[in-house]
Amino acid sequence: MIETDKLAAPARVIAATPASSQEEAFERALRPKLLDEYVGQEKVRGQLDIFMHAARNRREALDHVLLFGPPGLGKTTLAHIIAREMGVNLRQTSGPVLERPGDLAALLTNLEANDVLFIDEIHRLSPVVEEILYPALEDYQIDIMIGEGPAARSVKLDLQPFTLVGATTRAGMLTNPLRDRFGIVARLEFYTADELARIVTRSAQLLHARIDPQGALEIARRARGTPRIANRLLRRVRDYAEVKGDGNITRAMADAALAMLDVDSVGFDLMDRKLLEAVLHKFGGGPVGVDNLAAAIGEERDTIEDVLEPYLIQQGYLQRTPRGRVATAAAYRHFGLANPQGSGASELFGDA
């Protein structure tokens, strides 16, 4: 049984990154354990099912797997599922934690045959650690230095066959030598509203919360295509329904709760609207460089590129061009504004 959620709301309720270690623990309780329970990502699921089946039949380690895509789409969940489906242990770490070659060597030498090593944020591995990883991935061997100064010598250690599962939100930051060593590369895409509604319904059952199909769909529509956000919104809507209603999550109850949270009909919060309004009002619809945009809304460049932009671009409200960011006709419509002739947006997209 999952205990009552006692989390405080994060700064952005629609942020795709975990708000705290408590929320991470709560996510684990809702996480599907097997590939058959995993909703969405049909192409990736189909590929992994075949590759894992073949590896199990041959009693071999699965090829190394690279999972990339925006945060909150299930990369960590898939790593856990791979280990469970293969019937092996999972060892989990992240790129920034592996500061020295010895840190990685300690992990690798403790792996059992065919185990899964999951490295989150693998694009943040230091170059010296990455160099140690290359022979481990190709030949299941590592070279370590013993001693110091003139007495130092290199010792080659054999490793058990293993599977590296790397996850990243910034695939472009991976070095070519590292990327080329992954036999399986999969991009996770944003989820549809129907897929998210299925996830919300399943999570509600685990939380012993009452929800009707329209209530689940309303939450799903505003979850920005991201399961992590959908589950977070569900918990907040459940709180609202228990205090303001009879605990049953209907469409009207979900709408009222999400309005209180300042999440609008397409899943935008204050920061999304602030970014789009800056492009529209301060820069005439664009184009505007990302550094100028960051200064205008008081955010870091990385926050705009990694957190705010992906969903706005994917949904067609913002466009990246060689000259900068441009608001699309959909952005004008969302704010009830006329799309002025001769603006950056109308030149690129027209008034349709």
From Swiss-Prot:
Role: The RuvA-RuvB-RuvC complex processes Holliday junction (HJ) DNA during genetic recombination and DNA repair, while the RuvA-RuvB complex plays an important role in the rescue of blocked DNA replication forks via replication fork reversal (RFR). RuvA specifically binds to HJ cruciform DNA, conferring on it an open structure. The RuvB hexamer acts as an ATP-dependent pump, pulling dsDNA into and through the RuvAB complex. RuvB forms 2 homohexamers on either side of HJ DNA bound by 1 or 2 RuvA tetramers; 4 subunits per hexamer contact DNA at a time.
Region annotated Large ATPase domain (RuvB-L), chain positions: 4-191
Residue segments, region Head domain (RuvB-H): 265-352
Family: Belongs to the RuvB family.
Residues that coordinate or bind DNA: 301, 320, 325
Keywords: ATP-binding, Cytoplasm, DNA damage, DNA recombination, DNA repair, DNA-binding, Hydrolase, Nucleotide-binding
Subunit structure comment from the entry: Homohexamer. Forms an RuvA(8)-RuvB(12)-Holliday junction (HJ) complex. HJ DNA is sandwiched between 2 RuvA tetramers; dsDNA enters through RuvA and exits via RuvB. An RuvB hexamer assembles on each DNA strand where it exits the tetramer. Each RuvB hexamer is contacted by two RuvA subunits (via domain III) on 2 adjacent RuvB subunits; this complex drives branch migration. In the full resolvosome a probable DNA-RuvA(4)-RuvB(12)-RuvC(2) complex forms which resolves the HJ.
Domain of life: Bacteria
Catalytic activity, reaction form: ATP + H2O = ADP + phosphate + H(+)
GO CC annotation terms, alphabetical: cytoplasm; Holliday junction resolvase complex
Subcellular location: Cytoplasm
The gene coding this protein: ruvB
Entry's EC annotation: 3.6.4.-
CDD domains: AAA
Small ATPAse domain (RuvB-S): annotated segments: 192-262
Entry domain remark: Has 3 domains, the large (RuvB-L) and small ATPase (RuvB-S) domains and the C-terminal head (RuvB-H) domain. The head domain binds DNA, while the ATPase domains jointly bind ATP, ADP or are empty depending on the state of the subunit in the translocation cycle. During a single DNA translocation step the structure of each domain remains the same, but their relative positions change.
A Gene Ontology biological process term: DNA recombination
Binding residue positions for ATP: 30-31, 72, 75-77, 138-140, 181, 191, 228
Name listed for the protein in its UniProt record: Holliday junction branch migration complex subunit RuvB
Keyword Iron assigned: no
Family annotation (Pfam families): AAA_lid_4 (PF17864), RuvB_C (PF05491), RuvB_N (PF05496)
Database matches in HAMAP family: DNA_HJ_migration_RuvB (MF_00016)
Positions of Mg(2+) binding: 76
Enzyme class, first EC level, given as a word: hydrolase
Gene Ontology terms, MF aspect: ATP binding; ATP hydrolysis activity; four-way junction DNA binding; four-way junction helicase activity
